[in-house]
Amino acid sequence: MAVEKVMKRDGRIVPFDESRIRWAVQRAMWEVGIRDEKKLDEVVKSIVQRINELYDGKIPHIENIQDIVELELMRAGLFEVAKAYILYRKKKAEIREEKKRILNKKELDEIDKRFSINALRVLASRYLKKDENGNIVESPRELFERVAILAVIPDLLYDERVFDKNGNYSQDLKRVEYYLEHFEEFDRKYSIGKYKLNKYHFERMVNLYKELAEQGKMKVSIDEFLAMLEKGEFNEYEKEINEYFRLMTNQIFMPNTPALINSGRPLGMLSACFVVPIEDDMESIMKAAHDVAMIQKMGGGCIDGKAKIIFENEGEEHLTTMEEMYERYKHLGEFYDEEYNRWGIDVSNVPIYVKSFDPESKRVVKGKVNVIWKYELGKDVTKYEIITNKGTKILTSPWHPFFVLTPDFKIVEKRADELKEGDILIGGMPDGEDYKFIFDYWLAGFIAGDGCFDKYHSHVKGHEYIYDRLRIYDYRIETFEIINDYLEKTFGRKYSIQKDRNIYYIDIKARNITSHYLKLLEGIDNGIPPQILKEGKNAVLSFIAGLFDAEGHVSNKPGIELGMVNKRLIEDVTHYLNALGIKARIREKLRKDGIDYVLHVEEYSSLLRFYELIGKNLQNEEKREKLEKVLSNHKGGNFGLPLNFNAFKEWASEYGVEFKTNGSQTIAIINDERISLGQWHTRNRVSKAVLVKMLRKLYEATKDEEVKRMLHLIEGLEVVRHITTTNEPRTFYDLTVENYQNYLAGENGMIFVHNTGLNFSKLRPEGDIVGTTTGAASGPVSFMHLIDAVSDVIKQGGVRRGANMGILEIWHPDIEKFIHAKEKNIGTNVLSNFNISVGIWEDFWEALKEGKKYPLINPRTGEVVKEVDPKTLFEELAYMAWAKADPGVIFFDVINRRNVLKKAKGGPIRATNPCVVGDTRILTPEGYLKAEEIFSLAKERGKKEAVAVEGIAEEGEPYAYSVEILLPGEEKVEYETVHGKVLAVADPVAVPAYVWKVGRKKVARVKTKEGYEITATLDHKLMTPEGWKEVGKLKEGDKILLPRFEVEEEFGSESIGEDLAFVLGWFIGDGYLNVNDKRAWFYFNAEKEEEIAVRIRDILVKHFGIKAELHRYGNQIKLGVRGEAYRWLENIVKNNEKRIPEIVYRLKPREIAAFLRGLFSADGYVDKDMAIRLTSKSRELLREVQDLLLLFGILSKIYEKPYESEFHYTTKNGEERIYRSKGYYELVITNYSRKLFAEKIGLEGYKMEKLSLKKTKVDQPIVTVESVEVLGEEIVYDFTVPNYHMYISNGFMSHNCGEEPLYEYESCNLASINLAKFVKYDENGKPYFDWDEYAYVIQKVAKYLDNSIDVNKFPLPEIDYNTKLTRRIGVGMMGLADALFKLGIPYNSEEGFKFMRKVTEYLTFYAYKYSVEAAKKRGTFPLYDKTEYPEGKLPVEGFYHPEIWNLPWDKLVEEIKKYGLRNAMVTTCPPTGSVSMIADTSSGIEPVYALVYKKSVTVGEFYYVDPVFEEELKKRGLYSEELLKKISDNYGSVQGLEEIPEDMQRVFVTALDIHWLDHIIAQASIQMWLTDSASKTINMINEATVEDVKAAYLIARFLGCKGVTVYRDGSLSVQVYSVEGEKKKRRFKPKPSEYAKKILLEIVEKEPWIKNFINVDEILNGKKEQLLFSLRPANESKLKVPGREEEVRPGNIPEEKIRELLGVVYCPVCYEKEGKLVELKMESGCATCPVCGWSKCVIS
């Protein structure tokens, strides 16, 4: 009976497969050169027959079958084959053992066997999870399962049963927040079929639910959804997980590295790369540096090892330094984290908890510690020492964040290098837990303070022994009565009280008592005894109470003190109290015989908390009563917190607190009890003690938890007093804390601390003027060094974590310096964290072509700085790329040629927006400024936000510039009538915007009956009660809404003081400038305003040092001033035209109020109807006053008085004159605006006395249109305000531009498909490519990437937001070279290029197919409608060439137009690095770098052979160790080796076997069909010239490449330049293929001018021998082959030099782990390790 089943080594039973026996025997025959198919058939038949005979239907073990194979081969006389088979078995056994060792497993499973040793080594080194001992605890199966599970989670939430893309549903998000806060409790609780979701899967799932629910798209509640999941209603998606698992474990596709590492794990970040914007201002530069650090490090900073920390382990508390904590768990095993450049201890399996702060709930919580980190920070890193008013000290890295309380009671994070003196930090605070007093620990504390142990010797005959004796002392006999009561009750012992002078004591000899307290107090010399700490807070606080009863005292300062010689105990107690909000400090007190360390508490709130936690349990009644007396008499102290009264008032009012002002005092009323808060409302500073008293009263009245949390928060506050820096090298530490990412730590106290491609073209050039300082700018190269330094700080140990891409555009004035930025990088580390590229535009190529000078432009001014020779610039660029492999080039003109996202990304923009004229005033944080001035200022600052290509009119400008404006924020009720009507005034908030100068357009003036007016374009929209309405559609009688707001203290950019502002207001009202006499005159009513006249004179004398006298003329007083006072007034008012001086619009609110008070006191009055009036001949003045009044929420109306009036005037001679006026204007303030005016501005003297506010009505901010008059054309301006789309202009609410740009901060979400897996063989053994399966896999991978966006945990909120605006994905390829090997197609052939085009066309077509289907079900990406996709355009060059289509693109485009797309971009070809190693295939779209090279493993050295090449060698009987060595010595190439057949030499080509021209054609062929770019290296041999590089650039651009990275072999070398007398000759020098030659000739025919720059004949036919500059050392005997790490030994190079070169020339991972220097090779434009897969770009 035939055998049907076989037992594998892992115990699995699998079907018997005869083909596997055939393949094993065939390989053995090939090994010895036998290619006899007939003999093969005979042997296999006999083997199978023998198996059936011996086992007769039973199940043999695989080893039994292999034994039979050996015997049958020998029976057949094939002894050499049998030997080869035995060696094969042995080698397979060795491989299995090596795999077990790598994976830390006893047995391999089927998944493990699919991966090579090399793949498993890469997985083990970077991807698989490890335990506390550094052992691998995750198998490849488990890794790919967690990745697959996460990938399918979005499918559940997009299921039509729970999701509606058009829905408008409302769900309870509080339940969602509950699940997010408690996600740890749901670890492995839910399943999708057989697959359990871990807690991180669960958290990402709930987070996605929240996101979709916030958009109204979830049809069911979170509880209903989870119930469905629990019932198995989503189990159908198990097959999706199975499929992704199959695709990955069969190495058909691989996600990028971050996804493999972080899926289903705490970090959760799945993206490979990010775009960080950088603008031409210091804030943006520093923000870019910060964001680079955040992305590369994904955490905060680190703190000094001396900082103390309290943590809990297994319910036991510990108080140690950070350094001691690290050492405590070091036995669990350290690991080096090459991703983030640090040493760490994984304690995720150990229940360690620290005190963390939850900024949302404002309370102390327990934070789970997962990892303890250690960093070495050298001299190059500036460390910051932060010291608070309470003496708390933290020495930290510059990027370490702290929690800061703003004056508005908001909690923000600030890095150490952003902190300033006066900032309010959040420190230790009460945790709100109850506390139980335990006498046993009190007694231990008392013994520690006033007890001693000694050895007592018994001399009683027959009972001689030594035992421990405990003696306790105190001056109070009552203490011993209490102690004896406890001892008798607990131990059954009571001791007689003895006395020595004035001190009482007891002797305790009972072993059970002494041993008990000896054990409790063990370790006290090092701080609070561990046995007591372990028992938690109840034990520790009781212990401290005992200490205080023994050694503490209450002082009259007032305060409490505890002094001891045990420094570490005092330090521990200090830190412990601080952790609970008791702000204790330490001081040293000298004694004759040493030092006492004194802990003292003085702060009122801390004394209160000390009493509640400790003091009330003091057993010394005298101390307790004295402490109570101190508290009752405490005046609170004068320590003030700079907090905003109005913000607190708004919060406290919700809890029933009323506030009144009594003169200068602020009064809070709680249940009719009045509590003084000092002068808070006027000084915006409040005593901490006063605030704590008030909050305690409020909590007593309300018992509200939120009030309690606010009280605890205030108690925990400390203020930064000093900040110093040091560059001394230090070892720093940090923790990874789940959820809260912070912990409580510090020296001498405790505060909460957080754990832990760039385009420089917008930066102004070096030496340019900096507007804010008139200093000189540093230039982009300088700031590139800054970002580089940030990356070096992150690197910290010499091992690079990642690299930055720096781009400078060719028109920038610093372009020459940028090109040469790495010129000094010869054996050094200059800018080693940067790959740099030059961005080139069309105009440069035109200038090069025509031989014209090329202008370099200042990005700030737009002006030409100088003109350069483009040919010289081009040659410099090519030379540096030849010499240093940097910079690369980016062809921006090619990139933008098919950019369908231009409109959506904010540029180009059509500027057809509604606008206002230049003198329209816009509310900004700097003041109430004119639109034309805002544009000029913004342009000078140079921060461009967008560019318009259409709609800019005559005299307009295409660029928009960044500004900030103010908009009304939340409203608060200022007044409520008896009828229930309310008046609400808003607080303005600052929002980002950008301003346009649009040019000349037709405008109209809108006038209202109240006097307000605005001039704007006819399509400009104003807010009305019915909504937005265009100016051109307004008519007489229409209503317009005005915003009602009051500016805050931060408003305004200039200050003159309130007194001078009042003087200026009076002068505008009743003043005159005599420019001939150089004198300014002020006028006053002699009877009623003499006091004001004296005051104004005194103010001017005080400020300007002038002499001024008052002159009385009848009922008038005149004050004339000269000198500095005159010049000051003349400079401000300019002339006697009655207008508001421009400076007033920039003043601080109090100064504007003082100005208006002066103006109204001079020219205003209060009428009989109690209306406040201001009269003037100048209507313009009153209009301007209207605008100023609106800054305080005050409405007004202007009346025209056309009737004649008389003015009486008395001359200096006493003559009375009468002046008649034909008319004047009067501004009138009525209703509730009068009340606001009285409160905010007021009048001086008798006018204020006349003002009665008894009857006030609420007035509504609504005005009535009087007329709309078309004026003609004027220059107009507009503002784009993202998200808000409005701004305040002349008091009106105006609608802004409609375009909203896509900000930068996008991310790359990548995966690569292994092309080699789709090469199949027909029945004749002929290879073919399975296009159908390929199409299927492309769509699956596109879905995987689309899903990954939804479950990604992005490092910055900007990245999260902007990634989801476009949902850009990057389906890519790898294994191209291996696929071509299998198909027998040369890489550098017309057939090869054709295959590249087709395979990429399929990639993009079917990625789009998925995206269309996803759009139908899930919706389009948010910016879809703003792109050119709806117009039928695609960002794919091949689409515009129908003659080369293989697929129906026209039909696809129609589907896109009908249904839209889910993803803005879908394909790219990134570097694949280690991911291709995991997939056991060739890297990305590159040719292989070497077919054979030597490699070391634990069992020895062996030759690594490309698997496809190896199979072919064996198939042809060519395989041998001798041949492998020969190929390895031939630079890994088979070219020119007579042992290798010609057809194999043609197919099996390496990177350096291929001419650079063919490399470019390969890149262009692939680029043609990608939506994004292709990463590929243009390899050149060492002998290549600068002319070759120039030619490569020109040809690459003409062929449509989006960028080029040239790597000349050897240009990464660290050796100095040398001229080689005899040039080393490779055996083989590549020549361009015939197809490449044809393409080159076609380009030259089309663009003949390029012959001026390249030598076409030399490219086609090779060049003559000549001496060349080389980066190879002069004494080098042979070129190194990548991967042959034995070529360079660490001992040959100084250690410090090695450290500099890691990540630049040598692999950092191989050196750190194995001490080997492995040279990096260029692959896909990135320096990559050929051994472990480490990549400089960290893309995959």
From Swiss-Prot:
Q: Which GO MF terms does the UniProt record name?
A: ATP binding; cobalamin binding; endonuclease activity; ribonucleoside-diphosphate reductase activity, thioredoxin disulfide as acceptor
| ATP-cone domain ranges (all copies) | 4-96
Report the record's Gene Ontology biological process terms.
deoxyribonucleotide biosynthetic process; intein-mediated protein splicing
What does the entry list as the binding residues for substrate? 257, 272-273, 301, 913-914, 1297-1299, 1471-1475
**What EC number(s) does this enzyme carry?**
1.17.4.1, 3.1.-.-
Query: Which top-level group of life is the source organism from?
Result: Archaea
Cysteines joined through disulfide linkages: 273-1308
Q: Which cofactor does it need?
A: adenosylcob(III)alamin
UniProt key word Hydrolase:
yes
Keywords in alphabetical order: ATP-binding, Autocatalytic cleavage, Cobalamin, Cobalt, Deoxyribonucleotide synthesis, Disulfide bond, Endonuclease, Hydrolase, Nuclease, Nucleotide-binding, Oxidoreductase, Protein splicing, Repeat
Q: Do the record's keywords include ATP-binding?
A: yes
On cofactor binding, the record's note says: 5'-deoxyadenosylcobalamine (coenzyme B12).
Catalytic activity line of the entry:
a 2'-deoxyribonucleoside 5'-diphosphate + [thioredoxin]-disulfide + H2O = a ribonucleoside 5'-diphosphate + [thioredoxin]-dithiol
Q: Which residues form the DOD-type homing endonuclease domain?
A: 443-582, 1063-1194
PTM comment? This protein undergoes a protein self splicing that involves a post-translational excision of the intervening region (intein) followed by peptide ligation.
Q: What does this protein do?
A: Provides the precursors necessary for DNA synthesis. Catalyzes the biosynthesis of deoxyribonucleotides from the corresponding ribonucleotides.
Quote the protein name from its UniProt record: Vitamin B12-dependent ribonucleoside-diphosphate reductase
Species: Pyrococcus furiosus (strain ATCC 43587 / DSM 3638 / JCM 8422 / Vc1)
Gene this chain is encoded by: rnr
